[in-house]
A protein has these predicted regions:
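Secretory targeting and sorting signals
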Residues: 1-23
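Polybasic, low-complexity, intrinsically disordered segments
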Residues: 20-32
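Glycan-processing catalytic domains of CAZymes
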Residues: 29-274
Length: 274
């Protein structure tokens, strides 16, 4: 498909053709040694009621009446970020941190050794997240780009490779180390960190991430796993692709989520919960 929405569509269809999710429980907390969280004083900390738009394809429509936009970090122009800021909106930088995408301008920076199995969509492969010496500088450069364009936060996509047939023997502990690294690096740049999916590690990652974003937790009856973010007073943004509003909005309101319905293409169209 040649755009960032590929990863979102893979999630929507559940088990991707070449990369079906597998059970891979995380290691016990006592077995992990994680670095301390890096504070992000003054960073964007949205209210749980924040309204939002998620557009990863097409020319950004800046006229949607919401408080936050989540848009592609590479393709969105700095002028668009400025325009949204001038309208009083926060702007989140979408990056795929766990997959290689052949159309990205830095695609040649990824050596063959870190590119694993296809994730089921043309031009994408899982990354060997254990190799921070290789991936770290690339991801830092991407976050530098987000900061230079004026974004307020980073949405890290595909950060649950340990639960998929990635082509590497990734463990839950590997994923935790990588995700913590990403969040801390975002905070070093004054960017809030948005955790995408990875429901199985929420309790461990809560000290590091400022916001949660989830796809289809109502469809798969997984939304209760996001309660730690709610209890901490942090925003939880959720999207459903197949359910009608009446099938999830009452529960979303009860849980304190900011939820909406989107089409798989992740273009302008949105249907928010009332």
């Amino acid at each position: 498909m040649g755009v960032a929405v590929i990863a979102a569509v893979a999630t929507v269809l559940g088990a991707a053709p070449a990369s079906a999710a597998v059970d891979a429980p995380t290691a016990p907390s006592s077995a992990r040694v994680l670095p301390d969280p890096i504070d992000c004083e003054g960073c964007w900390a949205p209210d749980p009621s924040t309204t939002w738009q998620w557009q990863l394809q097409g020319e950004i429509d800046t006229a949607v009446d919401v408080q936050m936009y989540d848009v592609d970090g590479f393709e969105t122009r700095p002028s668009t970020v400025r325009e949204l800021h001038e309208a009083g909106r926060a702007v989140v930088c979408y990056l795929s941190a766990g997959s290689w995408e052949e159309w990205r301008p830095d695609a040649a920076d990824f050596p063959r050794s870190v590119k694993g199995a296809k994730n089921g969509w043309p031009g994408e492969r899982w990354l060997d997240i254990r190799k921070l010496g290789v991936l770290g500088p690339i991801m830092q450069a991407r976050m530098d780009l987000c900061a230079a364009k004026g974004f307020d936060a980073v949405e890290f996509d595909n950060v649950d490779g340990y639960r998929n047939r990635s082509g590497f023997p990734l463990t839950g502990a590997d994923q935790l180390r990588y995700n913590v690294y990403l969040a801390n690096q975002a905070h070093r740049r004054g960017l809030s960190a948005v955790l995408k999916n990875d429901l199985g590690q929420i309790r461990d990652l809560l000290p590091y991430f400022d916001v949660a974003l989830n796809e289809q937790c109502f469809q798969y009856d997984e939304c209760n796993r996001l309660r730690p973010f709610v209890a901490a007073g942090r925003a939880v943004f959720t999207v459903e692709y197949r359910l009608e509003l009446h099938e999830f909005c009452p529960q979303a309101a009860e849980l304190g989520f900011s939820s909406m319905r989107k089409k798989l293409s992740l273009r302008v169209w949105r249907d928010p919960c009332p």
